[in-house]
Amino acid sequence: MARIAGVDLPREKRVEVGLTYIYGIGLPTAQKILARTGVNPETRIRDLSEEEVNRLREVIDKEIKVEGDLRREVSLNIKRLMEIGCYRGLRHRRGLPVRGQRTKTNARTRKGPIKTVGAKRKK
């Protein structure tokens, strides 16, 4: 099992798909990495040579922000928005949708389970 950026990549997957298991690398980024390193995207991870794995590791470490660093940057960005008191920061603080979605109905993912208030009782 190849280990890149602290993530064990699944042996049976194609390299192109396997790289997407790393937080911060999607399919387009994975394709760019493979083009830059000269690794065939159709190759299975189990079939990669040690040299190919090292080339992938080198490009990812030097040029792309992934895993812990990226998570830290995102959380610091959100914290900064909350500190400066902008609209997006207030929405984050209140646990509401940030990007203009409706909240009269829906938005349950962000707001959490329904809190029923004043339900009528049967007499």
UniProtKB/Swiss-Prot annotation:
InterPro entries for this protein: Rbsml_uS13_C (IPR027437), Ribosomal_uS13 (IPR001892), Ribosomal_uS13-like_H2TH (IPR010979), Ribosomal_uS13_bac-type (IPR019980), Ribosomal_uS13_CS (IPR018269)
This protein's UniProt keywords: Ribonucleoprotein, Ribosomal protein, RNA-binding, rRNA-binding, tRNA-binding
SUPFAM superfamilies according to UniProt: S13-like H2TH domain
KW Repeat (keyword) present: no
HAMAP family (UniProt xref): Ribosomal_uS13
Subunit structure: Part of the 30S ribosomal subunit. Forms a loose heterodimer with protein S19. Forms two bridges to the 50S subunit in the 70S ribosome.
Family note: Belongs to the universal ribosomal protein uS13 family.
Protein name: Small ribosomal subunit protein uS13
UniProt source species: Desulfitobacterium hafniense (strain Y51)
Source species taxonomy: Bacteria, Bacillati, Bacillota, Clostridia, Eubacteriales
